Amino acid sequence: MSIFPIVLALLLIGLEETEALDGYPLSKINNCKIYCPDDDVCKWTCKHRAGATNGKGDCIWYGCYCYDVAPGTKMYPGSSPCYA
């Protein structure tokens, strides 16, 4: 039996969920969602890291998940910005 399938499976499991540059995990479903431990951190993360605003500079978040990433924002190296 080859060890290759086992190694490949472990790699794929590890790639299911990645971390953003600030260490918070990106959602598996929608990279626009950013988990934050509390409202203050969530607001700061939306405004400074994700650029998640309503076009007026106000941060948009719900349940400590940030949405509506501004155009041109890089969520993770090599990935395109997403729009909620």
UniProtKB/Swiss-Prot annotation:
Its Gene Ontology cellular component terms are:
extracellular region
What does the record say about tissue specificity? Expressed by the venom gland.
A single GO molecular-function term is: sodium channel regulator activity
Signal peptide as annotated in the record: 1-20
Q: Report which superkingdom the organism of origin falls in.
A: Eukaryota
Q: Where in the cell is it found?
A: Secreted
Sections of the chain in a coiled coil:
none
* Cysteine pairs bridged by disulfides in the record: C32-C82, C36-C59, C42-C64, C46-C66
Q: PROSITE patterns this protein is in?
A: LCN_CSAB (PS51863)
> Per its UniProt record, what SUPFAM superfamilies does this chain match?
Scorpion toxin-like
LCN-type CS-alpha/beta domain location, by residue? Answer: 21-83
- Keyword Disulfide bond among UniProt keywords: yes
Keywords in alphabetical order: Disulfide bond, Ion channel impairing toxin, Neurotoxin, Secreted, Signal, Toxin, Voltage-gated sodium channel impairing toxin
InterPro entries, from UniProt?
LCN-type_CS_alpha_beta_dom, Scorpion_toxin-like_sf
Role summary? Inhibits voltage-gated sodium channels (Nav).
Family listed: Belongs to the long (4 C-C) scorpion toxin superfamily. Sodium channel inhibitor family.
Q: Quote the entry's note on domains.
A: Has the structural arrangement of an alpha-helix connected to antiparallel beta-sheets by disulfide bonds (CS-alpha/beta).
Q: State what protein this is by name.
A: Toxin To7
Source species: Tityus obscurus (Amazonian scorpion)
